[in-house]
């Protein structure tokens, strides 16, 4: 009898703990805060892997595999921006694409003229995704297109891959939350106004022994590229 009572008390305690966890989850508006890992066997299948009911609840996501424009449209929706750049209920804050690969194909991810290309972070890829705080880019990308991160004011952590060779104009404009940025040694060009409005940026690290001279056609940084960079 005592043994039975002990088990009963143990089970009751377990139910109390589980109930407490359930309440905590409810208090968090039902958001999924643990990292969700999605492995795609084929580009364009992210909409099938993450249903519409869960897209607005995931806050931490890692994608493994090839992704195209169809997938990118979903990523933008999860990060708070729609196909027409309107706000969504998406709460995605942390995104890890370090084991993903951007490929061409699929539909447009923004309006009717934004498509993915192999190993390129497309123009306006994260335009106005201000809720995004941390991002690791695919290890194989070679370029970041114009306005890719424009308006990402909440972004505080960004990992750029060593394969990166060019950053286009306005790429990081308005990223006021960034305080530091490490540029890979293979970077050869930075477009006009790439860091315009990055008012919180206090340090930029460039991992190379020697920068090519201005006007060499390989690497040139002009004042307007860092307009609003108060610490420069």
Where do the language-model regions lie?
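Boundary at the C-terminal end of the N-terminal hydrophobic targeting segment
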Residues: 22-27
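Consensus positions within tandem repeat domains that build extended binding/scaffold surfaces
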Residues: 122-125, 145-150, 168-173, 191-196, ...
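Bacterial N-terminal signal peptides that target proteins for export
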Residues: 1-11
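Structural signature of tandem-repeat unit edges
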Residues: 33-41, 59-67, 87-119, 130-143, ...
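Bacterial N-terminal signal peptides
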Residues: 9-20
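A structural signal for leucine-rich repeat
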Residues: 75-82, 109-114, 217-219
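A generic local structural motif
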Residues: 2, 47-49, 221, 230
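Short, T/G/N/S-enriched strand-turn elements that build extracellular solenoid repeat scaffolds
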Residues: 44-54, 71-80, 216
């Amino acid at each position: 009898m005592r043994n039975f009572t002990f088990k009963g008390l143990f089970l009751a305690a377990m139910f109390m703990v589980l109930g407490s966890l359930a309440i905590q989850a409810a208090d968090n508006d039902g958001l999924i805060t643990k990292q969700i890992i999605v492995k795609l066997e084929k580009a364009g299948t992210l909409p099938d892997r993450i249903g519409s009911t869960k897209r607005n609840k995931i806050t931490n996501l890692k994608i493994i595999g090839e992704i195209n424009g169809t997938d990118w449209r979903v990523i933008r929706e999860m990060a708070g921006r729609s196909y027409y750049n309107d706000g969504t209920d998406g709460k995605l804050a942390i995104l890890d694409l370090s084991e993903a690969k951007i490929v061409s194909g699929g539909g447009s991810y923004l309006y009717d003229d934004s498509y993915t290309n192999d190993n390129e972070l497309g123009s306006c890829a994260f335009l106005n995704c201000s809720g995004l705080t941390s991002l690791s880019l695919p290890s194989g990308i070679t370029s970041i297109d114009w306005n890719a991160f424009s308006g990402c004011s909440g972004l505080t952590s960004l990992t750029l891959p060593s394969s990166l060779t060019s950053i286009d104009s306005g790429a990081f404009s308005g990223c006021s939350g960034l305080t530091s940025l490490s540029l890979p040694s293979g970077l050869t060009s930075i477009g006009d106004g790439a860091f315009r409005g990055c008012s919180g940026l206090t340090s930029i690290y460039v991992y190379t022994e020697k920068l090519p001279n201005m006007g060499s056609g390989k690497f040139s940084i002009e004042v307007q590229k860092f307009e609003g960079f108060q610490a420069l």
